[in-house]
Amino acid sequence: MLELWGVLSLTSLGVMVIFLFSKIKSSFAESVKYAGYMNAVLLSILLMSDESEMLFLKWEWVKLGGYSLMISFRFDLYTCCFFVVGLYVTWNILMFSFYYMSTDPRIDLFCKYLGLFLIAMLLLVSAESLFQLLIGWEGVGIMSYLLISWWYARSDANTAALQAIFYNRVGDIGLLIMLMWSLVTLGDWSFTGLYALDFVNTFFLLGVVLAAAGKSAQLGLHPWLPAAMEGPTPVSSLLHSSTMVVAGVFLLIRFSPIILNHKEIQLMVFFLGTMTTLFSAICALAQNDMKKVVAFSTASQLGLMVTAVGAGAPQLAFLHICMHAFFKAMLFMCSGSFIHGLQNEQDVRKMGGLYSAAPITSVCFFIGSAALMGVPFLAGFFSKDPIIEIININNLNSWAVGLVLIATSFTAAYSVRLLYFSVGGVSRMLVLQPMNEEYGNLIGPLQRLAYSSVIAGVVFIYFLSPNQISCLSLPLSLKLAAVFVTLVGGLIAWDVVNLLHREESVTNIPELAFEAQVGFYPLIMHKLIPKVWLNMGEMYQMQVMDRGWTELALPQGLGGNYKIMADNVVNAQTSLIKMYIAVMVMMGGLILGIMICL
């Protein structure tokens, strides 16, 4: 069966390549449709398959001395499921792009970049060696830069793209550490060889954690994720749902068999994910930009996925990746539809009453927010609740349970706040124009993703989980803890926004400065520290640091020596005939004396 999986997956990849290089718009759109049809076939095969073996496609690429660089693909359950989800979500985003970017003169190039973005991610997911993973890893990095800076005339877009590259370069150091250690120690880059080792050095695992933290925007390397909202909305949708940001989590899932055998590294991953999910949820509470609220929700969910890996449940982390892709892509597309209809207005405080102007988009936005909160029987419920239950029974650290539950309640709070300010209430704009929802490329993708957000949890939990995750026997209070804190957070948020709405004037609360300023991290790291170093460099110049020896030995020293030599040559040329004759006589006498002596 998995041989068929491999053929179908590679066929889907071929379809994507075909429309990437198509020059005629009709053939381009037709190829996108074929890609969507192929996903339906892949999903059908997934539902019928209950096998767990892996298929390896391997051949020699380059031979250097005694070492052969192999190209090999790994088609296991993770790869096949991600192919289905990634292709399905990207197909809908591409169709949405035809609506959102219809006035862009380079829309064909834009859609091809989106396709290349997905292909790089699929290469990363299906890689069976660190070298192939590096190709996909750098591929999603460069494509994210090109897409975030798509509107290159905007300075904020260019700054955000550079910020994404710089922060990911820090994570790339971890990946290079993995490559070097594996080659020196094992002489091979294959995952199979790494899994077979009895002991893996902590240095290697620290590289895994650093690489994952950079790519998945964990705490400390997170500022690039909300800044990336400067790109077009389809880019944000694809970036946050099924490509770049989940690459780091997927790396942790791939190496989870090794990580779970090292308790110190496992605790580090657990702690990093817990702090990220709480910090991002706190920051999302005070954001007023619609896309940034959704972006911080992504960072919070990524932290929850990392926490699941640290808690010893990588299967649940992967399940949450799949569920999260559906409703997060839909949330961004709904946000883009609202922003597009409101003439690029992104401040939620200026919105309101959008249900009357765009009812279909508003309903989809509500479904996506409910799935994000973990409302029972939607997609998010089937992945978030098991993660929280696993955290409740793990023996790593008890305080993490409380932090994750607080973050879950905050998720409900900022989701309700976002719904209230955008869809609910009355319009706070001077004139609210009706939004045209008759475009098939707008409504079709939203409806498909809305249906997926409703039924995907049932499908995936039924066909994937029984063979991978054992059922948990917990007290009723622990089973209902996630639902309870979600309900409490939503009710508190609803009460607060109603209270603030009734107040004639609202005094600025100093405590909100921390959330609104993203914990002051960008202010400290991007402004304060560089300014301090610049001032120190101006105060303590190189001559103070080394007393001028460096400058004297190189620029001034070399120049001074050449000047002395040149002066000696010039002084010898005095244009006096008598001196020239005297020198000639002296040299002649010297030569004659030497010849006589010999």
Swiss-Prot record:
Which sequence ranges are marked TM in the entry? Answer: 1-21, 28-48, 81-101, 115-135, 171-191, 193-213, 233-253, 265-285, 293-312, 323-343, 362-382, 399-421, 454-474, 480-500, 509-529, 576-596
Tell me where on the tree of life, at the top rank, the source sits.
Answer: Eukaryota
GO molecular function terms listed in the Swiss-Prot or TrEMBL record: NADH dehydrogenase (ubiquinone) activity
List the GO biological process terms. Answer: ATP synthesis coupled electron transport; electron transport coupled proton transport
A cellular component term from Gene Ontology for this protein is: mitochondrial inner membrane
Q: Which reaction(s) are listed as its catalytic activity?
A: a ubiquinone + NADH + 5 H(+)(in) = a ubiquinol + NAD(+) + 4 H(+)(out)
Enzyme Commission number, as recorded: 7.1.1.2
Compartments in which it is found: Mitochondrion inner membrane
Its placement in the membrane is given as: Multi-pass membrane protein
Swiss-Prot/TrEMBL keywords: Electron transport, Membrane, Mitochondrion, Mitochondrion inner membrane, NAD, Respiratory chain, Translocase, Transmembrane, Transmembrane helix, Transport, Ubiquinone
Q: Which InterPro entries match?
A: NADH_DH_su5_C, NADHpl_OxRdtase_5_subgr, ND/Mrp_TM, NU5C-like, Proton_antipo_N
Its function, per the record, reads: Core subunit of the mitochondrial membrane respiratory chain NADH dehydrogenase (Complex I) that is believed to belong to the minimal assembly required for catalysis. Complex I functions in the transfer of electrons from NADH to the respiratory chain. The immediate electron acceptor for the enzyme is believed to be ubiquinone.
Q: What family name appears in the similarity comment?
A: Belongs to the complex I subunit 5 family.
Name it.
NADH-ubiquinone oxidoreductase chain 5
| Species in which this protein is naturally found | Branchiostoma lanceolatum (Common lancelet)
What is the organism lineage in this UniProt record?
Answer: Eukaryota, Metazoa, Chordata, Cephalochordata, Leptocardii
